[in-house]
């Protein structure tokens, strides 16, 4: 049995978990999340703890224990604390702003790039070169951050573009050593 799958998930008092068939619903102060868990695993909630168990004795159930436990633990963390991803814009004239809920970015194209986030994702722009993405669903926060980064990925020569906070970009040397004839 998986070591991660064996660990119980601590459930805070303000979080409510309901199970209907293979659907797990987690409700808390930051929202409500719902996810299907594999049919060969089951979730048991007791005394403020949740434990993932195999539904049968077949091997696929064992293989999914750690994944299922981590997904449910992320749901519990999401509805209590939430998740956040920070992005930085690097480059001359690269800037971001909010127009209502819509994120508008100037990324060196001939037109501004506009992005409308999903309803349960919150975007904040504290400075023109910083974007903060928050939400209860870890997967969705990461997907939105990756989508925004894909509008102008950091290029390898000067590092200009949208990058995750703290991301290191390996720069290439360029054509500096070229001889003239």
Curated annotation (Swiss-Prot):
Q: Does the keyword Ribonucleoprotein apply?
A: yes
Keyword Hydrolase found: no
Any one GO biological process: cytoplasmic translation
* Source species, domain of life: Bacteria
* Gene Ontology terms for molecular function: rRNA binding; structural constituent of ribosome
Q: Which UniProt keywords apply?
A: Ribonucleoprotein, Ribosomal protein, RNA-binding, rRNA-binding
The family database entries (InterPro entries) matched by this protein are listed as: Ribosomal_uL6-like, Ribosomal_uL6-like_a/b-dom_sf, Ribosomal_uL6_a/b-dom, Ribosomal_uL6_bac-type, Ribosomal_uL6_CS
**GO CC terms in record:** cytosolic large ribosomal subunit
Instruction: Spell out the NCBIfam families in the cross-references.
Output: L6_bact (TIGR03654)
Q: What is the documented function of this protein?
A: This protein binds to the 23S rRNA, and is important in its secondary structure. It is located near the subunit interface in the base of the L7/L12 stalk, and near the tRNA binding site of the peptidyltransferase center.
By sequence similarity, the record places it as follows: Belongs to the universal ribosomal protein uL6 family.
Query: Tell me, how does this one assemble?
Result: Part of the 50S ribosomal subunit.
**PANTHER family, from UniProt?**
60S/50S RIBOSOMAL PROTEIN L6/L9 (PTHR11655), LARGE RIBOSOMAL SUBUNIT PROTEIN UL6M (PTHR11655:SF14)
Q: Indicate what this protein is called per its UniProt record.
A: Large ribosomal subunit protein uL6
